[in-house]
Amino acid sequence: MVRMKKARKTEKANKAKKDITADTEASVVDVNSLSGKKVDKFKLNPDIFGAKVNKPLLHDTVVMHQANQRQGNTSTKSKGFVRGGGKKPWRQKGTGRARAGSIRSPLWRHGGVIFGPVPRDFSYEMPKKMKALALISSLSAKSKDNEIMVLEKDLELKQPKTKEIAKLLDALKSCSERVLFLYSTRNENLIKSCRNIKNVTLKTCSDFNTYDVLSNRKLLFSKDTHDAIVKRLKK
């Protein structure tokens, strides 16, 4: 009996080890030139793009993000806040009617609302480590779904050119898909070039979050941006 238990524990440990090894295998993706042609292969960092995907944590992070976006200004009036209703409609006894104390009772037309919503703050925060793990999980999920595109270098535009970005997306066959475009350093020309394209979300590698990754179909960044993302998440 003891030997059987030890054998089961060893088997479980080996299985877990295999699962971890499988999860930490990062994808090898194609490197695209700025004209959209495949020029090389690139191995994504296994700790960031090959980790185990924690679906419950991803769900919690998305719920938190959506809660933080709520304005929280919905408002209703209870019996005490509706105008009027201070006088008792009729005497308590002797009329044959049901007793009533106010015409603004929730049972009456134009009455108050019972336990209705009032303005409040819905926002809350998660621990920093959980946020970081959720972001790693989202990047790993994109890697496993082959939804990451890598450029050989950052785009350097001398002037705003929406046409150049549209041409690149067309070459990468991502015109009709939602794309999260990450870049390492702020570039005003790039921002102006992308803001008129409906399906493109432009973010720096220091301020994108889990919701940004999951709400877009494809992820696009350069080799330098990849290194900056790894540096951010390995702190």
For the regions a protein language model found, what residue spans apply to each?
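Short, structured surface segments that line ligand/substrate-binding pockets
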Residues: 71-75, 80
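Glycine/serine-rich anion-binding loops at beta->alpha junctions
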Residues: 79-115
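Extended polybasic, low-complexity segments that bind anionic RNA or targeting/receptor surfaces
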Residues: 1-67, 71, 117-235
